[in-house]
């Protein structure tokens, strides 16, 4: 599924709206122009000369650079706001699953090398420049930092009445600079005090505990093969989970080398794999606990792509258990020695940079790989397709799809890191003109697959080694390489060079009918969410508006 559909006129004027209010734009840019001209006359010291500066000069340089950085951030957001205004607008495609907003977010994401979601967040933040022109003027002049502006934009997001927003903008612009160095919670309280004065129904109540239920998984730690986990649950669910993890942790024999905390953590992984018990780690065939099968490993498929010797690695005995005893401190111990971490009991074995990549893109070190193999993980050898002929159908075979996913590891759009497992296999040159061949196939998440298929502004060219060269609607080009190149530099992924394909006319009307549709347009969804969150203040407003009791 690849091709071209609509070529929107990106140069067309945006309908009247926040981004096209001449008064707002004049206020923001005129105030900023004089301030920025003065600011950039600051003589910032050369980094090589800082060693000759006194402490006062160093602190002054830090402050000046912070102002310049804030002004630059404001200008970056101004450019994002302008681009958003040019790309979005009322259109018959507003109910498309991949709409004009997504088109703009794709350009921002590629330019900043960030994810689609983060780019969309930057776009929402940029719109606050015109919602709050007086605050924006301070930001553009470097008098407010990006952190403070972001908090103001978030806390005032529910204010939609123009008069209340104007009063709030003036009040925040007058007082924000005098708040000084406050923590985020204190800044929120200071901002909320003004919102409560001018539009109490717009107070953010989304931090109510029940509404903040979430479970987050952090970025993998490539050295340790672990990832952070945090979140908020209903108290009853948390109690059940806590009790269940403890029960599973105590279900192993006394010879299990792991601590109780480590067993509880492993028990959560076992629950995720659908197990009702935690496999014992004693390694004894006659373990009295009878919990020998590790369901966590049974749910893992190891794709061998380069060096099969990694499969022979041995489990690390020091991955579990208590920390080794620290070296004793003596009167002769130096401060440097006291602060230096204790060495590991045994030096870790040297392995290739990466032997296993998880679906989330994290690296699993060889010792952990050995643990998974010992627990019964499935091993699959990825076959290189070589110079085989193209497959005669649209959908690639399982083996070909496996090669493409292992080669790419993630979505190939610039800045996107959706794991290949959850991506579509996209024909770079549209089928049937483009063959089902590894030199013409890549991973694309559903959002970017739709973007490329239904919007002709984006074009891509794929090279035999898997390199993809993207061209944005604005003419900028971005080159992405297969993710395996980073982790498996010796794996030869180059396949046959394909003849150049010709382009044919696309039946725009017919293909447009295939675009998935939204239940509500983005604008309608935004209005629904704002109204729903404002409704959380109804009880507060009713109590606040009660007449005096006398």
UniProtKB/Swiss-Prot annotation:
Q: What's a Pfam family in this record?
A: DUF222
Q: Name one GO cellular component term.
A: peptidoglycan-based cell wall
Q: Does the keyword Nucleotide-binding apply?
A: no
- The protein's superkingdom reads Bacteria
Q: Does the keyword Signal apply?
A: yes
**InterPro entries associated with the record:** DUF222, HNH_nuc
Signal peptide start-end:
1-13
* UniProt keyword list: Signal
- Annotated region Disordered: where? 312-358
Family membership, please give it: To M.tuberculosis Rv3776.
**Name of the molecule in the record:** Uncharacterized protein Rv2100
Question: What species does this protein belong to?
Answer: Mycobacterium tuberculosis (strain ATCC 25618 / H37Rv)
